[in-house]
Amino acid sequence: KTYEGSADNMADALEVMRGLIPTHVVFNGKKGSMTGDNALKAKVGEKVLFIHAQANRDSRPHLIGGHGDLVWEAGSFNDKPDTNLETWFIRGGSAGAMAYEFRQPGIYAYVNHNLIEAVLLGATAHVVVEGEWNDDLMMQVAKPAPISG
């Protein structure tokens, strides 16, 4: 459906909003804005601070491949941070922060842990981390191969 003017869709938009069922849940304004060529970049050993703000709905951020070394769920750096969280909680209408030191190279996925929103609606960001693999942290015991059976 198309509209001639920017306000012409108001009745249809309000009808969708009344259902409280989002059609998009995105990071940085649009689906895919922080994946592929637009992925965030980091290097092994770098500490990265993630700020997560949520307007209307609660969110459960999670870094697949890592975790929150330091997490300020309510966003106040004056408060003592929680440590080593897999997933944390950001209340609707608030913001929080998480710091993580990348220890291995690879592609990490920062998601809303409601994975339906992450995968189908766009709440995913990627961090491409460059550097040398550290076998002291994790060793590959068998090379990747096709699954048989």
Regions found by a protein language model. Give the residues of each.
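Copper-binding active sites and cupredoxin-like electron-transfer domains
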Residues: 1-149
